[in-house]
Amino acid sequence: CCSQDCLVCIPCCPN
């Protein structure tokens, strides 16, 4: 999830 698409995985990427 939090690897390439941070836009799609918001819960995974707080920043």
Curated annotation (Swiss-Prot):
Its name, as the record gives it, is Conotoxin QcIIIA
Family per similarity comment: Belongs to the conotoxin M superfamily.
Q: Which UniProt keywords apply?
A: Amidation, Disulfide bond, Hydroxylation, Neurotoxin, Secreted, Toxin
Residues modified to Asparagine amide: N15
Q: Where in the cell is it found?
A: Secreted
Organism expressing this protein natively: Conus quercinus
Citing just one GO molecular function, the answer is:
toxin activity
What UniProt notes about the protein's domains is:
The cysteine framework is III (CC-C-C-CC).
Q: Where the protein is mainly located, per its record?
A: secreted
Q: List the disulfide bonds.
A: C1-C13, C2-C9, C6-C12
* Record carries keyword Disulfide bond: yes
Functional summary from the UniProt entry: Causes scratching in mice.
Positions bearing 4-hydroxyproline: P11
Specify whether Iron is a keyword of the entry: no
Please give the tissue specificity annotation from the record for this chain. Answer: Expressed by the venom duct.
GO CC terms: extracellular region
